[in-house]
């Protein structure tokens, strides 16, 4: 009964909140132009492709910039700045042929802009969270560790329209990986002149379908069509206004009133209501994403104990969370790699996954007792979450599950930017996370828990044997053997309770039926260059 009361309370509180919310009116669109009003959950912290790390940032940056490859409407890799490429027989050398293209200030985009960008992101002074992706380039890790000069990075520009990348190991998924913002070029001529100030409106120079017009924190990021873009003739939307919409119920009402054309999320347990009052707007779709709990194993002594981590994970009623609380198509997760990822051999899962919840609760209490906790000396933890309503409801369900095994958990809710700053600084005990695939390969998930990844291994999970398996997979040329090695690595991490998977996500976008070109895809990429808005 406690669980159903929690779900009912959540729905009732959301209804009250929705009734109290207002919202700004839709801004005027110049005559003859197409404008897109876009709810984007939170403000970007950075529009620099090499220092950004949030999904909300990548949405905007991905409309401003284009890498060697880019996303088709279905999320697959297609030519971007590169018109073609070929790989050597050993898979270690890739040659890319660049198109004639300009930056938004009219200067040509050259291969040297890419070389400069890759050296910049790997420079230890940049302190990029995503540098670990670019360490796939030859000597990338040594450069990022400060043990080799920037010139050692495996990227060369024989001429203005040829880029040669040399890799540390074969990577058949490289065209997918190169869509990621960490591999975007930056305008060398601007960054060298302005430094970090290059990202400000009036200074920002882009090579993608849009250019930056304004950025008002807490209000709006505005971009306009870039006439210098190589495919500008086929870009429909002239202006995009991105709004922070942390209050998803308020954003839902704004979409309903026509003030927003898109909001990138909605409250899961409101799906049936939305479908009733706004038919055709809700676009739930399975994506390559997992939400999970991260345990701070560096600073929190009890969480260094695998028995405690297992107890906390075993006690979570995943089916209640996905089927009763969320109810938008999420699936319970007993592994980290979600369904549908290419190049993988599925089968790894938490060893106790098939046990009924009651049995798991008994085991969890016993494990806590073995670790020295009791009713007189209960385990006390803080669960830190971002301020999204969805995440708070999840946290409350986990809190209740832990109470059932004698764990006293408090919830600390912070603004998204503050929460992630705390995660990066390891200023948390347990954190509620989610991870959307950066590219279609299991490494985008399993690599997060590698010891040398850095800040995004939020819990500082360290297991040399796990690292060794991932490194062996990197060097394995046989695709089947590589997939099996990655499966062994995931099973090892799950046996060690390196994190607690909770559910496999669905994208939950609200899209006005007047918006065309929005295609569901596993990576949840929806670049604005493919969208249009039908006039009434």
Task: Name each model feature, range by range.
Residues 21-23, 156, 322, 357, ...:
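Extracytoplasmic/peripheral linker and loop segments enriched in polar/acidic and small residues
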Residues 39-89, 119, 203-206:
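N-terminal lobe/hinge region of extracytoplasmic solute-binding protein
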Residues 110-117, 160-166, 170, 208-209, ...:
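Alpha-helical secondary-structure segments
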Residues 113-115, 122, 126-189:
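Surface-exposed binding/hinge segments that line
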Residues 146, 160-161, 167-235, 239, ...:
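Gly/Pro-rich hinge or "lid" segments in bacterial periplasmic/extracellular proteins
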Residues 195-201, 227-273, 399, 408-410:
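Ligand-site clamp/hinge motif
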Residues 332-370, 388-393:
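Structural transition elements
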Residues 509-536:
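Long beta-strand-rich cores associated with HINT superfamily self-processing modules
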């Amino acid at each position: 009964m406690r669980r159903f009361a929690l779900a009912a309370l959540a729905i009732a509180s959301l209804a009250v909140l929705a009734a109290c919310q207002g919202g700004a009116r839709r801004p005027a669109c110049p005559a003859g132009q197409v404008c897109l009003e876009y709810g984007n959950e939170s403000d970007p912290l950075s529009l620099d492709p090499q220092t950004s790390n949030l999904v909300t940032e990548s949405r905007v940056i991905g409309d401003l910039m284009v890498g060697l490859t880019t996303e088709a409407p279905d999320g697959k890799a297609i030519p971007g700045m590169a018109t073609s490429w070929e790989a050597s027989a050993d898979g270690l050398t890739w040659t890319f042929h660049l198109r004639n293209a300009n930056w938004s200030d009219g200067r040509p985009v050259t291969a040297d802009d890419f070389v400069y960008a890759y050296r910049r992101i790997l420079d230890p002074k940049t302190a990029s969270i995503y540098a670990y992706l670019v360490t796939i380039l030859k000597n990338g890790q040594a450069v990022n560790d400060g043990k080799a000069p920037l010139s050692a990075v495996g990227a060369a520009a024989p001429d203005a329209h040829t880029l040669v990348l040399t890799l540390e190991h074969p990577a058949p998924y490289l065209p997918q990986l190169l869509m990621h913002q960490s591999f975007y070029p930056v305008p060398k001529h601007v960054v060298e002149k302005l430094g970090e100030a290059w990202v400000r409106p009036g200074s920002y120079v882009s090579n993608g379908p849009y250019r930056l017009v304004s950025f008002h924190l807490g209000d709006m990021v505005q971009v306009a069509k870039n006439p210098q873009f190589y495919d500008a003739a086929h870009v429909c939307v002239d202006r995009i206004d991105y709004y922070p919409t942390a209050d998803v119920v308020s954003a839902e009402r704004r979409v309903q009133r026509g003030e927003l054309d898109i909001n990138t999320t909605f409250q899961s347990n409101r799906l049936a209501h939305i479908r009733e009052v706004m038919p055709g707007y809700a676009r739930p779709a399975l994506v390559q994403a997992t939400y999970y709990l991260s345990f701070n194993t560096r600073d929190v002594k009890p969480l260094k104990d695998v028995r405690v981590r297992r107890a906390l994970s075993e006690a979570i009623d995943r089916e209640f969370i996905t089927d009763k609380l969320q109810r938008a198509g999420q699936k319970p997760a007993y592994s980290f790699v979600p369904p549908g990822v290419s190049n993988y051999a599925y089968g790894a899962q938490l060893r106790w996954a098939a046990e009924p919840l009651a049995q798991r609760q008994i085991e969890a209490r016993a494990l806590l007792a073995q670790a020295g906790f009791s009713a007189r000396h209960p385990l006390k933890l803080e669960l830190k979450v971002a301020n999204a309503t969805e995440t708070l409801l999840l946290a409350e369900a986990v809190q209740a599950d832990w109470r059932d095994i004698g764990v006293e958990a408090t919830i600390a809710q912070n603004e998204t930017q503050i929460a992630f700053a705390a995660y990066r600084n390891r200023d948390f005990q347990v954190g509620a996370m989610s991870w959307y695939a950066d590219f279609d390969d299991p490494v985008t998930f399993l690599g997060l828990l590698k010891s040398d990844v850095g800040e995004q291994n939020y819990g500082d999970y360290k297991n040399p044997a796990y690292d060794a398996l991932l490194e062996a997979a990197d060097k394995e040329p046989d695709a089947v053997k590589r997939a099996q090695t990655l499966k062994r690595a995931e099973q090892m991490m799950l046996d060690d309770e390196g994190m607690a998977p909770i559910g496999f996500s669905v994208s939950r976008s609200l899209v006005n039926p007047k918006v065309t070109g929005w295609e569901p895809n596993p990576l949840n990429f929806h670049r604005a260059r493919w969208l249009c808005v039908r006039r009434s």
